[in-house]
Amino acid sequence: MLYKILEANNGLPSNAKVIFTNTGREMEQTLDFVQECSDRWNVNIVWLEYDELDNQITKSTSALFEPTLDYVIVKIPRWNFDKFEGSERTLGLQMKAVGEVMAIGRSFQEALHKATQSLEIKRNGLGADGKGYKDYNTIINKLKYASWDRVFVIYDAIKIGISLERIYEITKIDMWFLKQYEELSNIEDEIGKYNISIISTDLLLEAKQKGFADRQIAHMLNCLESEVYKKRKENNINRVYKLVDTCAAEFKALTPYYYSTFEQEITDKKGITYTQNESLSTNKKKIVVLGSGPNRIGQGIEFDYCCVHGVLAASECGYETIMINCNPETVSTDFDVADKLYFEPVFWEHIYDIIQHEKPEGVIVQLGGQTALKLAEKLDRHGVKIIGTTYKSLDLAEDRGSFSELLKKNNIPYPEFGVAETADQALKLADSLNFPILVRPSYVLGGQGMKIVINKEDLEAHVVDLLQKIPNNKLLLDHYLDGAIEAEADAICDGKKVQIIGIMEHIEPCGIHSGDSNATLPPFNLGDFVMQQIKDHTNKIALALNTVGLINIQFAIKNDIVYIIEANPRASRTVPFISKAYKQPYVNYATKIMLGKNKIDDFEFKPSLEGFAIKQPVFSFSKFPNVNKNL
């Protein structure tokens, strides 16, 4: 095979962290050392032999040692085309991804499945979820033109009978990869011949070793996910955790950096059956912090900042810290941040198995953005303690209708509103609300699905579209306060006392999403009367929601009256900005309050800021030339 060089670049490539993290290569350590020497002695060059550096994973070998891997890494980009209607979704020379996920498995097939489960695009893996393409022409077109979802389309093509030779002819993807897909398709077909009662242990184990999720197997067997979970537990088909050691167990690794897989049981000379689990659970008090998953619009690196500082605070409180995340771009997935790192999908099945293995005191969900919050309901239902604000309060704030009733009960101003679950209900509400109307679904990220409508035709079309995309959702319709000023406040609450850590005024008018708005800290144009209302409302809402930890509240101000837009009892994207502007470790304080270690009065809040701090978003519209660029 002939290889040709396309380009060569000095410096670190975008996938450098994936390579360094999983091979133990010390490029980052070398660069840090060079920079430190350069800064300290004002020199430009430091010559360092590679064998002078230690392998940071094994701690017992030098960096001058070729990595030996007994695991496979799969990286998949994360796109956000749904935010850009009309955008060109074909991939090409210009990068369009907004983030990425990484997965580790014993085989390519297992790692591929885990990576697709990490994407958070409402897929349970490759196939076996009823969401694949079935139209021949659509599939052929997506194979011809590199589509963002081609990793799924290849599987769909095999399922409808398109030959591997034809797929190779169109895509030029190596036949080895296509045969891996074909094997997965054959396993799905085989499992489909059985039901949950008669499927063999060997076939179920093989499916799990290939990375199929319990949900996918349930889809194949036409049963519940819980039945598959119960079946594999009865047959001792359990996850085991392996070290990412860079040396295939040739040397002892000291870094607690794990991935999951499934193994055949081993029987020793004494007849004892077991599986080799390299992650040994201790008797220490433990806390799990759920990460924020892949970067995308509405959920970026701000939440990773919160997760990292939360982990460090929990460690200061004497807990063994356990981080779960799948984003290779983050600091939280550095193998020396938490006491244990599980590089796993932030996906229910994986999370629950880790919790069953580690038996932590509880799980922190309010630092990982919407990704972690979406798991709160299942954690609560399965008896897992949520650290800080309870699931009941989290759900109350997320449910637009229930939250509006809470405001009404506490005499806090809010725009006229109504809750609709059908288009007919929405049209009836419109008669009493008056246009323009803001339509907002519950339980969404980054303003997804929110829209201002100005007539009944627009309202009906948008509600029908929303309920198709997000079935069984409660939609909040409220009268849009045209011309209002928008502001937001972040606060910490210990359940009895509230400390506001920052109030920001948006420069754009109300109606521009807070993540897209320029904002100033502190406000530059709000009078004392308005500021006092913001403080009073923040105190009332934080206490009414029984908040323990962080809370963010957004306001609309019109005619000197402060109305509530929404409240989120979790870390917001502005917390890192406020913490850095005021030079205060607010996430550290909030985490210690969540853990019950401290109260508000235990901390000295001394924000330090001369002048104003300005938050300004950065857009990438140049990547999407044909989309509407209006905010």
Predicted regions and their residues:
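Short alpha-helical "recognition helix" segments of helix-turn-helix
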Residues: R166-I167, Q216-A218
